[in-house]
Amino acid sequence: MNLVMLILALWAPVAGSMPELSLTLFDEPPPLVETEPLPPLSDVSEYRVEYSEARCVLRSGGRLEALWTLRGNLSVPTPTPRVYYQTLEGYADRVPTPVEDVSESLVAKRYWLRDYRVPQRTKLVLFYFSPCHQCQTYYVECEPRCLVPWVPLWSSLEDIERLLFEDRRLMAYYALTIKSAQYTLMMVAVIQVFWGLYVKGWLHRHFPWMFSDQW
């Protein structure tokens, strides 16, 4: 294209029938604009986490309850931590419920999460936190375990399924036996009440000879 424009520019004065063309082979680069330097980052080397611990359990109905403890040189205020849960299939999601700060000192921070329903196949609970707003993010993980009492009268079938998922088969079979005995006694009690209120009175009215003294 540049070669064609060059031929036309040289031929135009001779022919006298074409206007003059301005020939620009290269555009000049724009001038450099000086920008203000970025402010220096603050020194955050003094903030660090020296110890972290996580405890989490699953109560009846798949309700997650977790407690995290952090120790170290932490900023005031501390950034809000984030909590995620991961299932066996690899699916992860953030817990929208904010954790509760139950700290008693500035050196040790304690965060508590309670009564949040998670899937029964939850494998890990991840807790992300930072000692300051510009510090590196740390995380600690814990594997929730189903909390079932020794007399699991109020445990559900979902809790037994969770015990099998955790490979705690002995506890799962024990809970299933207790629940079966509980349901059996409840059915016997219902049958006795139904017999005393309805069946026995109906028999008295229609078959009085069944309750005579001759029998």
Swiss-Prot record:
It comes from the Viruses. Changing residue 192 to V: Loss of the capacity to induce the degradation of MHC class I molecules. Keywords: Disulfide bond, Early protein, Glycoprotein, Host endoplasmic reticulum, Host membrane, Host-virus interaction, Immunoglobulin domain, Inhibition of host adaptive immune response by virus, Inhibition of host MHC class I molecule presentation by virus, Late protein, Membrane, Signal, Transmembrane, Transmembrane helix, Viral immunoevasion. Residues 47-146 form the Ig-like H-type domain. Residues 1-17 form the signal peptide. Residues 18-182 are lumenal. Residues 204-215 are cytoplasmic. Interacts with host TRAM1. This is Unique short US11 glycoprotein. The lineage of its organism: Viruses, Duplodnaviria, Heunggongvirae, Peploviricota, Herviviricetes.
